[in-house]
Amino acid sequence: MSNMKIEKFNIRVYGLLFNRNNEVLVVDEEEYGLRFTKFPGGGLEFGEGLHDGLKREWMEELQTEVDIVRHLYTTDFFQASAFNPGHQLISIYYEVKLIRPIEATIHIHPFSFSDTTTEKLCFRWAQVSDSLLQQLTFPIDKLVAEQFVDTIKNDI
């Protein structure tokens, strides 16, 4: 455990969507002056269950509905938030499948933000390979990719 004073838990829920081309959907974002790449998802709201929170995040960000396929990972070590050092992250990852097609634009190049929106995020498919680990920014995402991407890739 860290020596810093932890004031709050920050519960995050993420969905990994794979396609037939051995790719996983990732999101590139810019916030607080930082650029980062992660799996789609976000923070749980008070009074919300994990599955409902994940489905809400996908609807908000990608304008699509998903079903939960299976639980992949829950953080089992201390991780401070990159944006709020006094917050301890608890991250839960699921494999998801689409109920209907994604309406949001899927980009080809990283950080291809639209000039017409204030929110800087864009989605793209990333090849399920060792290079995925270099593309992901946050330690828990890298751990999930390392532990589960090869297994899921073989199931596709």
Feature-to-residue mapping (PLM):
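A short coil-to-beta-strand element that immediately follows conserved catalytic motifs
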Residues: 65-74
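Conserved Nudix-box catalytic region and its N-terminal flanking loop in Nudix hydrolases
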Residues: 23-60
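Active-site-adjacent beta-strand/loop module that shapes the phosphate/pyrophosphate-binding cleft
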Residues: 79-108, 147
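Short, charged/polar surface micro-motifs in flexible loops or helix N-caps
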Residues: 18-23, 32-33, 45-46, 74-79, ...
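Charged phosphate-binding loop/patch that engages nucleotide di/tri-phosphates or the phosphate backbone
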Residues: 134-156
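A generic structural micro-feature
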Residues: 5-9, 36, 84-90, 115-120
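Conserved N-terminal beta-strand and adjoining loop/helix that marks the start
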Residues: 2-24, 43, 95
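NUDIX/MutT-family hydrolases
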Residues: 106-142
